[in-house]
Design a protein with these regions (language model features):
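Phosphate- and other anionic-substrate recognition elements at nucleic-acid/protein interfaces
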Residues: 1-128
Length: 128
């Protein structure tokens, strides 16, 4: 995927506490591979908390997966539901784009990417 599409940057969801050990292990392995691939290709990688992604896409950090899917479909003008996993990936990509470009639809807020204390929303200086 990296060789075919040559992205300038990558974004992934931060680790969350999973109730299922097997799921957490598989997620950790997938994240590790994604981080390694981005690192080897010298592609900057940013992480976003699920709550931050939901805030950016739906306007509330506690949005349900169905709400995220619906907003991703509307935002990208998709005619078919991409499914939960694909919608999550697209939402993370949109969140990364919004945080970098200051997209006018989300111009009231500037998104800070991950810091050790977690992601957070800040009021954007409208005079800038």
């Amino acid at each position: 995927v990296l060789a075919t599409h040559a992205p300038n940057e990558a974004a992934i969801e931060e680790v969350f506490l999973a109730k299922n050990f097997q799921s957490a292990l598989k997620l950790g392995q997938a994240r590790g591979v994604a981080m390694l691939a981005a690192g080897r290709a010298n592609i900057p990688l940013r992480e976003f908390a699920a709550k931050t992604v939901k805030q950016a896409i739906c306007g509330q950090g506690q949005a349900a997966k169905a709400q995220v899917q619906n907003m991703v479909m509307k935002t990208l003008k998709l005619t078919e539901n991409p499914g939960e996993d694909a919608a999550d990936a697209l939402a993370i990509a949109l969140c990364a784009g919004y945080s970098k470009t200051g997209d006018k639809a989300h111009a009231r807020f500037r998104l800070s990417s991950r810091s050790r204390s977690g992601s957070r929303w800040r009021m954007k200086d409208e005079s800038a």
